[in-house]
Amino acid sequence: MMEIKETRIYRIPSQNNIDPIDLFVTWYGEHRSQVVIRCWDKAWTAYWGGHWVEEVERFLLMDNIEYLVTSLARTRAHQERNWLKNIIKSIQQYLKAQGFEVAA
């Protein structure tokens, strides 16, 4: 059983024609995290057992939007994937404004 080390919640205001977003990060330690993204009446989740950097927020800032969309998308529908891509861009903009830096 994995022990939860920390849970962080980000309330991201509406920006770039995207409704407000709730980002829930559960950190299990040792580069292991789960992310839940909620926007409007939809939610997406993904678990990473090794995301190269300690803070998953920095991992979310890497130039890997297509990988994130594939990890989070519930369907292969073009409309959902495009919406999720814009949501991830909004999350990235917010995290950068909060002082998180892109992982090297």
Enumerate the language-model features and the residues they cover.
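Amphipathic, interaction-prone secondary-structure segments
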Residues: 2-46
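Mixed-charge, Lys/Arg-enriched low-complexity segments
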Residues: 57-104
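Detector for methionine-enriched segments
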Residues: 1-2, 62
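Intrinsically disordered, low-complexity regulatory segments enriched in Ser/Thr/Pro
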Residues: 31-70
